[in-house]
Amino acid sequence: MRTILISGSSRGIGLNIAHKELKEGNRISVGIRNLESLKGSVIDPNKWPEGRIIINHYDALRKITAENWIKNTVDEFGGFDSVINCSGVLSKVPFLYKDGDEEDILNTLNINFLAIWHLCRLSWDHLCTSGRGRIIVLVSMSGKRSKGDLAAYSSSKFALM
């Protein structure tokens, strides 16, 4: 059994990965912005035996929430051996962006790149202690082939490759 931190698991690929890991018998600690978003979902903690899933508030733009998430996971599960990074944002900022788009570009880079780097760095000692640590980062083909209006998104995904 693995114990896995999964970011961005309230919908989409992250939700499906979290569900798959639970079905395979693993314990998961999910980090999401909206704690209520899992009610009624396939990973609603009320649908699983106690001790299989914990829900943590995680805002990729606030490093303290990553620190708290890791601490809560270690306190509850005794540690973890995997981190799966699924959180991210899609922003439509073209390569020839307009003045004023810099904030959107920085937000995209902070969430899609720096937050993942921070979470992995904060997790590193725990992953090493487990003796079988794994880091999985979801990227996108857009990181290799940029479309005109996805320059910020593509740059943030390329930075992860």
Predicted regions and their residues:
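Rossmann-fold cofactor-recognition segment
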Residues: 48-62
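Conserved mid-core segment of classical short-chain dehydrogenase/reductases
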Residues: 90-106, 149-152
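Conserved glycine-rich cofactor-binding loop
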Residues: 10-11
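Residue(s) in the substrate-gating loop at a strand-loop-helix junction
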Residues: 140
